[in-house]
C-alpha cells in the first residue's frame, strides 16, 4: 500500500500533471503540423518545383525481386519531416517567448548597502 500511495503522490504533483498535459497537447499539435506540411505545404512546393511529389522522391538501392519489395531511401519523406520539425520548433519557440513575456518577472532582492549593514551591526553591538 505504501508504494501505491507514494506513486499517487508523485503522479498528482503539479509538474507531473502539467508535463502529461503538455505531452498530450504536443502530440495533437504534431499531428496538425504534419497534416499542414503533407497536405498543404508540400503540394504547393511541388507545384513551385515543377509538379514534383515529395512522397515519391526516393533513391532505389535495390530493385524489387518477386515478393521482396524494393529497398529505397525516401528522402522526400525526410524533407517533409524536417519541415514538420522546423514548424513545430518555431511554434514552441514563439510560445515560450510569449509565456516568458507574460510571466511576472521575479523581483530581484538588492543587497543592503554597506552603510546600512554597518549601522545594523553597530546597533546590535550597542544593545549587548
Swiss-Prot record:
Similarity annotation: Belongs to the MscL family.
Chain segments annotated as transmembrane: 10-30, 76-96
Cellular compartments annotated: Cell inner membrane
Pfam families linked: MscL
MF (Gene Ontology): mechanosensitive monoatomic ion channel activity
Domain of life: Bacteria
Topology within the bilayer: Multi-pass membrane protein
Segments forming a coiled coil: none
Organism, scientific name: Haemophilus influenzae (strain PittGG)
Protein's recorded name: Large-conductance mechanosensitive channel
Keywords, alphabetical: Cell inner membrane, Cell membrane, Ion channel, Ion transport, Membrane, Transmembrane, Transmembrane helix, Transport
Role of this protein: Channel that opens in response to stretch forces in the membrane lipid bilayer. May participate in the regulation of osmotic pressure changes within the cell.
Quaternary organization: Homopentamer.
Cellular-component GO terms for this entry: plasma membrane
HAMAP family: MscL
